[in-house]
């Protein structure tokens, strides 16, 4: 092989490496895509798909869609601003957590958060239509604070994040009137904290 041939091959390899895209976080990227599709459908249908599939509220237990909405509500968003606020945080925090805990564990955290927050809203707030990934966002935030867990004890970062976060939600729930479900944030954070503790303890027990 001549020098020129090697040079051409080297350039081709460099081009392939330069433009290579890594699908590094299938659960988080898949979640973001589903949320985007749900948002577009909601905008096209004037919110009817959100009411049908992507929000949770008190409805008949005989309706099969009621059970789909227990999970589906985390994919729905009221508009682009609502969507971007949640998805940007998920795309920043989520891939690091998926790399640390694995795709199946992170998927379990997301589904557990959806079920806990969905059932809580269904049972406690019959007149509230809940939608959005904010519960998942706070679950991932609290889960990320457990990344430093070791055999010496609970990391100080978790204590600080939990105290500031829970304090903020309690304050907003008492003194601030808005359309955000503070209970959803708190429950999502508790799910993330609880599962983060369990997942890290299991990981430590292997060593």
Functional labels for PLM-detected ranges:
Residues 2-207:
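A detector for small-residue-rich transmembrane helices and their helix-helix packing motifs
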């Amino acid at each position: 092989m001549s020098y020129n041939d090697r040079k051409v091959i080297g350039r081709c390899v460099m081009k392939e490496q330069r433009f290579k895209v890594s699908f590094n976080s299938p659960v988080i990227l898949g979640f973001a895509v589903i949320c985007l599709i749900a948002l577009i459908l909601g905008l096209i249908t004037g919110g009817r798909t959100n009411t049908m599939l992507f929000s949770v509220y008190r409805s008949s237990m005989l309706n099969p869609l009621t059970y789909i909405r227990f999970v589906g509500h985390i994919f729905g968003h009221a508009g682009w601003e609502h969507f971007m606020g949640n998805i940007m945080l998920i795309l920043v925090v989520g891939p690091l957590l998926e790399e640390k805990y694995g795709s199946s564990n992170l998927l379990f955290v997301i589904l557990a958060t959806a079920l806990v927050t969905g059932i809580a809203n269904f049972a406690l707030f019959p007149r509230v239509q809940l939608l959005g990934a904010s519960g998942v966002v706070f679950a991932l935030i609290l889960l990320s604070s457990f990344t430093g867990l070791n055999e010496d004890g609970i990391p100080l970062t978790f204590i600080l994040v939990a105290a500031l976060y829970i304090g903020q939600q309690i304050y907003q729930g008492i003194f601030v009137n808005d359309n955000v479900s503070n209970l959803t944030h708190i429950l999502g954070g508790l799910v993330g904290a609880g599962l983060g503790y369990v997942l890290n303890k299991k990981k430590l027990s292997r060593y």
